């Protein structure tokens, strides 16, 4: 038997026709379908919105009456350090107050017991506080400035990822003026500059109050900075005028933007100013009408090249046209254009809330350590862990 293994003959005209059908451009409806499928695939791949919250410190537990003034830092190795003031005998700003810290090596999911970074005088009424840490990306060293009784500036450092701390040194001689009678670092975090002539500079947002006899504006913000890796520190010109607790970021163009709590007549708004010389001098403060705020600290963080994040209490609209002074409803805001506009806002905590500190993990996850409670803002220091999808999802305003 003869078996013919050759393929069946197909006329060239039909092959040509088939080829034409295969290579015909898609119709408009086909293009729309393709785009729809791509958008669907993208949405399926996007991370779902996520928010987790828990109390990191609770008033009356772990040896202290109240925990206040949070600062949250991600180290060069990706560990998370949470700092605060442990107030032993009451919730007031002055008394027997220690600077304490907890440490996490799993992105803020679990934490070490707290340790005392610095305290003085045992049970004496000495206030150690206003933490404002910064990490030197070149060396991995963590620098932690703080205050004693708001009359002196000290700094300590860690070279082992926040496990232990050096003996503090007093740097008041180069970081205070003789006519100041009050000074504070932060509270919050400092930054290291990444652009231009001052690349590598460590910058610590700060504020001070002049003695009344000096006849200077009573309140002003300023910066502390170091150009030698933390060995020596100096201060900027004052940021005029009326600023208080502040935070600073470096913009994409290398300029600096400071956002400050306002004292006096502009208490209901935030203040902003800019610097083009690495923070040494500043424009006069402008009043930021997009960011209403009671008289309270706030947090400012760079998320990526253009996006900034901001957190603060956001009280309801006043009925009489006057800004509300209530510290309630901690809210996180997002700016897509380096702080020019703030179109996105999401409430993180409903009810009493006050100071906060934002941080970004290497994978983009966000953390916010903030003061919040049901009846009082200082019942707990709460840690929120969330992603950008939660902040930007529809209906977030």
PLM regions and their residue ranges:
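Extended rod-forming repeat segments used as scaffolds/tethers
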Residues: 11, 30-31, 92
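Intrinsic, low-complexity polybasic segments
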Residues: 5-22, 26-27
